[in-house]
A protein has these predicted regions:
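Non-catalytic connector elements of ABC transporters
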Residues: 1-68
Length: 68
């Protein structure tokens, strides 16, 4: 995969919660868990499953912060 995005965190998919339109994916990385919302169609197209190795690719202008 070739991309200009520099913030790539390798990890393992811990959880996928899907509904009809969107899915929430949690990737465990060395920096901690990263949660992403993508379309359920993309999850199916990439054949993503719990336990798969994946990269969290983060564009600096697209980061949201949520207090816990």
């Amino acid at each position: 995969m070739s991309t200009s995005i520099r913030n790539r965190l390798p990890g393992t998919i811990e959880e996928i919660v899907s509904d009809k339109v969107v899915s929430e994916i949690v990737i465990n990385t060395a920096a901690g868990p990263v949660t992403s919302i993508i379309t359920t169609g993309s999850v199916k197209r990439m054949n993503l499953k719990k336990g798969d190795t994946a990269f969290a690719i983060i564009k600096a202008t697209e980061v949201s912060v949520e207090a816990r």
